Design a protein with these regions (language model features):
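Conserved catalytic-core segment of nucleotide-activated headgroup transferases in glycan assembly
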Residues: 35-51, 55, 173-251
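Short boundary motifs at domain starts and secondary-structure transition points
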Residues: 13-22, 45, 87, 110, ...
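A nucleotide-sugar donor-handling region in carbohydrate enzymes
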Residues: 2-11, 135-211, 235-238
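Short, functional N-terminal and low-complexity linear motifs
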Residues: 8-11, 117-123, 187-189, 215-217
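Active-site and donor-binding regions of nucleotide-sugar-utilizing enzymes
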Residues: 27-180
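Active-site donor-binding acidic/aromatic loop of nucleotide-activated sugar
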Residues: 255
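Nucleotide donor/acceptor-binding cores
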Residues: 22-25, 115, 196-199
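Membrane-proximal basic amphipathic "stem/tether" segments
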Residues: 1-25
Length: 255
């Protein structure tokens, strides 16, 4: 099973490398299927209004993008092991766009070739309070969610004597999508004449996160308000804290 997956991933890498340079000029890399949420507005603008060809490389075999058959979007699945490491080291492209930080500081390195690396934030949080030191140092350009990112990155560059990056005030595409979706809903989904509100609990993950420290107590208190409560755990929590989520589901699932 593992060997068969590895063979498929190497074949995918070979298929990518066989493309003409113009067809792999712009590459998006996704750690998992959730990355599409942040990439889609950019991909649609590039392939639609600008008429560009892009490659979308994912580490998840369950990524919905693999079922997307569009002439201007070529998809590849390279897994998250040896093949991915080889892909990054040997990448030949003009631009690589990714939501994964820590480029060059852990196992994912910059290519030996000349590639322009662009980082896209997948959250609104601070760039230095929620990430490792050096998480963004090796990117060439960063799409900033807000002024705090721009200020923090410039301060970091000055403090450590780093080469200035291209900082683009891009906003948060995910929030734009949510607001656009809400505007498209029928009025009975958004009106709250009954007094019952829809409360979404969608915190981050990790040892200090809200659900890991106060999950059951929080949900119990919120349910006591009589409102409709939805708990949406972080994708990394789904991956690494399944037992905790299972307990929450068992305790509050019927609600």
């Amino acid at each position: 099973m593992i060997f068969a997956s590895l063979i498929r991933e190497w074949k995918e890498l070979s298929r990518f490398r066989a493309l003409e340079p113009r067809l792999r000029s712009i590459v998006f890399y996704a750690e998992d299927s959730s990355s599409w949420t942040y990439f889609e507005p950019m991909v649609r603008e590039l392939t639609g209004a600008l008429g560009k060809q892009i490659c979308y490389v994912t580490s998840s075999k369950d990524d919905q993008i693999l079922d997307l058959h569009e002439e201007s979007i070529r998809t590849f699945c390279i897994g998250s092991g040896t093949v991915r490491t080889a892909f990054f080291l040997s990448l030949e492209a003009d631009v690589m766009v990714m939501t994964m930080p820590d480029l060059g500081t852990l196992h994912i390195k910059r290519s030996k070739e000349s590639v322009h690396y662009v980082y896209v934030y997948h959250s609104l949080v601070s760039s230095h309070m929620s990430y490792r030191r050096g998480a963004f140092d090796q990117f060439d350009a960063i799409l900033c969610v807000g002024p705090h990112h721009k200020e923090e990155i410039r301060a970091t560059e000055e403090l450590y004597g780093l080469k200035p990056k291209i900082l683009i005030e891009a906003g948060y595409g995910r929030l734009d999508s949510i607001l656009g979706f809400e505007a498209s809903l029928p009025s009975h989904f958004t009106d709250s004449h009954s007094g019952t509100k829809r409360v979404l609990v969608a915190p981050s993950w990790g040892g200090n996160s809200l659900l890991e420290n106060h999950g059951p107590e929080l949900v119990e208190v919120l349910l006591g308000t009589g409102h409709h409560i939805t708990v949406r755990p972080h994708v990394m929590m789904i991956r690494h804290r399944r037992k905790l989520l299972g307990r929450l589901q068992q305790q509050f699932g019927p609600n």
